[in-house]
């Protein structure tokens, strides 16, 4: 129904929320196709939607724009602010009190914690080119 009358601007709120991965991909591809001749504004918490569709991103917090740029620009702005630390399960709680922690993955030698922030633990290995929009989200919103 949103496309009746061929509008030049589409406003979508969480267009892929609750969809299984296959349907999410289908909807994202459709939105990307529509964006060739329309302005599309969409609100989402699904970071992969942004990575696949957006050519410009506005991050809003309490109604204020806190960051803006292309996905690549936002990712590049995180250089030096994302690291990974290997620790034990017992150490996770303390690290979560001091740092913004992203994904926690099981590794052979313990747990790998993604750490995001202006200051990283000394033992953190900076991830370099392995930064994504999820890191940007954690930096600004967690």
Features from the language model and the residues they span:
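Conserved mid-core alpha-helix of short-chain dehydrogenase/reductase
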Residues: 26
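Residue-level recognition of hydrophobic positions within alpha-helical transmembrane segments
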Residues: 19, 45-47, 130-131
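Helix N-cap at the start of a conserved alpha-helix in ABC-type nucleotide-binding domains
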Residues: 21-23
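ABC transporter nucleotide-binding domain
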Residues: 29-115
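Conserved catalytic motifs of ABC-family nucleotide-binding domains
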Residues: 6
């Amino acid at each position: 129904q949103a496309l009746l009358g061929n509008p030049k601007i589409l406003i979508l709120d969480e267009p892929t929320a609750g969809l299984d991965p296959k349907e999410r991909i289908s909807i994202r591809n459709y939105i990307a196709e529509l964006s060739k001749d329309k302005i599309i504004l969409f609100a989402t918490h699904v970071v992969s939607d942004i990575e696949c569709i957006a050519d410009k991103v506005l991050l809003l917090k309490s109604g204020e724009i806190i960051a803006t740029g292309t996905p690549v620009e936002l990712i590049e702005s995180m250089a030096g602010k994302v690291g990974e630390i290997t620790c034990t399960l017992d150490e996770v709680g303390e690290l979560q009190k001091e740092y913004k922690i992203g994904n926690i993955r099981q590794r052979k030698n313990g747990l790998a914690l993604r750490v995001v922030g202006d200051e990283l633990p000394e033992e953190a290995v900076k991830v370099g080119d392995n930064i994504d929009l999820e890191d940007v989200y954690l930096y600004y919103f967690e």
